[in-house]
Amino acid sequence: MKKRTAELILKDPEKFAHHDRVFLNNPVVMQGMGLAPLVVVATTGQNGLMLAVAVALLLVPSRVLACLLSRLVPLRDEEPTPEQLQKKLLPRALLYAASAAVVYLAAYPILNFVFGTGLLNLGIYLPMLVVEPLLTYRFGRVQETVHKAVSKGVRITVGYALLLLVVGVVREWLSLGTVFGAPVGRWALLPLAKMPAGGFIVLGILCAIWRAAAAKRKEYLKKEARDTLTVHYQKEGNREP
């Protein structure tokens, strides 16, 4: 671990973890965003894969487009006044939703070419990604740069896509005894897993395990950071005449 990274971890561990949208601060696991597709339609590995690809095609481009368009009605203050919010929130929300809709119209032919009629398994939840909080939640936040929009968008995409695949594979295995259609067991362990109620149960258990692992990882990083700085200071002390 580099000295600068170690200093950042020890100075503000939560801020350091906040930037890790894949594991330590996954928006679904830690904030409960984007639950509907996970619970309702991520019932198989194939469905999870289709949703993951759709999110990959939608999230970053729509976030960048919305970032550019929302400059027409920017929010500059971290804590805007009620008057500012009343004046700007509605047009910003419309811009973010419209940006996602435009990107969706461009991405759908690609999804249709890759997955064909399999997209029908996603039902209304595919177009509903346009108003998914993961795509639109920024409309009420302070204006961000294009670089930050791309950086955060990529990290959120990876974190969400990973969870979609994991949930889809686990639910398919539990409910059907298969993984991407290939048999991996003699019987279904939990047929309820293919239903939304089972989806909540599976997702809840996975989130609990994920959070526990993330907490362990944070503790490990802090310990490693302390050890790194200790070794660094010892080396500096040995160099002194």
Residue locations for each model-derived region?
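Short, Lys/Arg-rich, polar N-terminal cytosolic tail immediately upstream
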Residues: 1-19
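C-terminal transmembrane helix-loop-helix hairpin of multi-pass membrane proteins
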Residues: 16-17, 21, 146-241
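Alpha-helical transmembrane segments of multi-pass membrane proteins, especially transporters
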Residues: 17, 51-59, 63, 88-104, ...
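Generic transmembrane alpha-helix signature in multi-pass membrane proteins
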Residues: 32-45, 111-116, 133-145
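Hydrophobic core segments of alpha-helical transmembrane domains in multi-pass membrane transport
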Residues: 34-39, 55-56, 60, 100-109, ...
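Selected alpha-helical membrane-embedding segments in polytopic membrane proteins
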Residues: 36-99
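A cytosolic-side transmembrane-helix exit/cap motif
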Residues: 68-78, 114, 139-150, 172-173
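Ordered, amphipathic secondary-structure segments that act as subunit-interaction surfaces
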Residues: 72-138
